[in-house]
Amino acid sequence: TQKWTLFPYTTLFRSGTKNYVSTDDLRMAVNASVTLERPLIIKGEPGTGKTLLAIEVAKSLKMDLIEWHIKSTTKASQGLYEYDAVTRLRDSQLGDERVKDIKNYIKKGKLWEAFESDKQVVLLVDEIDKADIEFPNDLLQELDRMEFYCYETGETIKAKKRPIIIITSNNEKELPDAFLRR
């Protein structure tokens, strides 16, 4: 496992770097999350640097950052994929050849993108508390197993490399206990 080199335990940058000011507790939490390969939940008021933390972690580990910004209308399944049945129906009526391959109508979500990456990435799930209360619980299995099933194609999508997952919350509403325990 690799250490988060931006804020290692022994460094002159005890309070962060030129781009990010950090506490010892935050450095320890990030390093524990990276080492244990568990998602890190960062809570705080808007504008306190939660999103910037994910950017700095990705930079320090020299990894790509995949950002999934959550809105009040976002569904957990959108992080996996979306199937566009309406366009497929229209294309079938027009005799389009694309209709023969259902994959042409699957829009990959940010989790799918992170899972299929050939190299490890940092996945930011930004402002998870904006979604409905069931949103976090709907992702539990996928985040635990690092895989999900695509019913339309009949394939199981497994993470090639386990992403480093950073989840932010503005404390607008409480996250479910089951989600926090994992």
What are these model-predicted stretches?
Residues 40-86:
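Walker A/P-loop
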Residues 128, 145-161, 173-178:
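Conserved Walker
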Residues 63-65, 177-182:
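A short helix-turn-beta junction within AAA+ P-loop NTPase domains corresponding to the substrate/partner-engaging
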Residues 109-110, 115-143, 174, 180-181:
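Conserved AAA+/SF3 P-loop NTPase catalytic/coupling segment centered on the Walker-B
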Residues 80-118:
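Short glycine-rich substrate-engagement loop in P-loop NTPases that contacts/grips substrate
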Residues 105-106, 112-120, 150-169:
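AAA+/SF3 P-loop NTPase mechanochemical coupling elements
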Residues 10-26:
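Dynamic helix-loop-helix/coil hinge segments at AAA+ ATPase domain boundaries and subdomain interfaces
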Residues 1-12:
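Short, small-residue-biased leader/transition segments that mark boundaries at the very start
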